Regions:
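N-terminal intrinsically disordered, cationic/polar leader segments
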Residues: 2-10, 51-76, 148-151, 155, ...
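N-terminal, charged/glycine-rich beta-strand/loop interface patches
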Residues: 2-18, 42-159, 164
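Long, intrinsically disordered low-complexity tandem-repeat segments
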Residues: 15-43
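Transmembrane beta-barrel architecture of outer membranes
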Residues: 105-109, 140-142, 167-171, 199-201, ...
Length: 299
């Protein structure tokens, strides 16, 4: 019996060793792939394309107990989604960057759908940094959001940083049914510490009950229309952001327009919504202004 036990133990040890070797080989392969991708020689580029294409998808639905489930949570390449502990009956998803980027020529997209009565919070684990790549093509980052009647979405990612030499176009389209609730924060930082910004174009389009609620576009950096850094636009500031809050109760009482800080203001929109626009010298000061505005609206 002792001999059989020893043989089985040796076989198990060999099996564990084989599994460890397989895991090490897989990890090495994944690491090599990521390093090649960062050098501009990844699998997608090797097939003759100019960048990496990836689409992440989230769908939230209310369950029988009144909580929120996620029947769709699809990561793709550099866009990794992770469910984390949420607030109350809301689900919470974090977007984790599994690779650097977007780089030149990349095509990233995030699609989010919130069903009737569902509540979803979406954030990110770190800032997104647009970087130059070997490909000189423009990179794109598209966000598509759909919130049904009675659904609620809090979209609160970290900042987007436009690094020197990068070229990125961001397009966000939000479609809200009547009775939907939304908190949407967008923050952009022009250049890392001590460097000039890259080229950044960003458009935000929001429809409420199929009618335009907000449609605005900003362009900054090399190649942007003249005056983007002048006193009528950024005035030398390097962090810009906005907070859009849509709530059905605003139909009865819409917050009054007011100045929140020297370079920040709250503006009621033609619908049950308010827009907070802010400029700041850095990302930390910008976040403080937007957080304070949201706290006042939540209070």
């Amino acid at each position: 019996v002792d001999g059989m036990t020893a043989v089985r133990g040796a076989a198990a040890a060999d099996l564990d060793l084989d599994l460890d070797r397989d895991l090490d080989r897989d990890l090495d392969r994944d690491l090599d792939r990521d390093l090649d991708r960062d050098r501009g020689r990844g699998p997608d580029r090797a097939r003759g394309t100019t960048g990496v294409s990836a689409t992440a998808r989230i769908a939230a639905r209310v369950d029988r107990r009144g909580g929120t489930v996620l029947p769709v949570l699809e990561s793709d390449g550099p866009l990794a989604l992770r469910r984390t502990r949420g607030r109350g009956d809301a689900a919470r998803v974090m977007l984790v960057g599994a690779m650097s980027g977007p780089l030149g020529g990349d095509r990233f997209a995030v699609e989010t759908e919130v069903g009737e009565g569902a509540r979803l919070d979406v954030g990110s684990a770190a800032a997104t940094i647009a970087l130059p790549g070997q490909a000189k093509d423009e990179a794109r980052y598209d966000v598509r959001i759909d919130v049904a009647a009675g659904g609620e979405l809090r979209w609160l990612p970290e900042q987007l940083i436009s690094a020197q030499g990068s070229d990125l176009a961001v397009s966000t389209r939000v479609e809200l049914a009547a009775g939907a609730r939304l908190v949407f924060r967008e923050e952009q930082v022009l250049g890392r510490a001590g460097e000039e910004p890259g080229r950044l174009r960003s458009r935000l389009t929001v429809l409420l009950d199929r009618r335009p609620l907000l449609d605005q576009e900003v362009a900054c950096g090399p190649g942007a229309p003249g005056g983007w850094d002048g006193p009528a636009v950024l005035g030398g500031h390097r962090a810009l952001g906005q907070l859009l809050v849509v709530r059905p109760e605003f139909v009865d009482k819409l917050p009054e327009p007011r100045v929140l800080a020297e370079t920040a203001a709250l503006t009621p929109l033609a619908g049950p919504a308010v827009l907070v626009s802010a400029l700041a010298t850095d990302a930390l000061r910008l976040r403080r202004v937007l957080d304070q505005a949201l706290a006042e609206l939540d209070g």
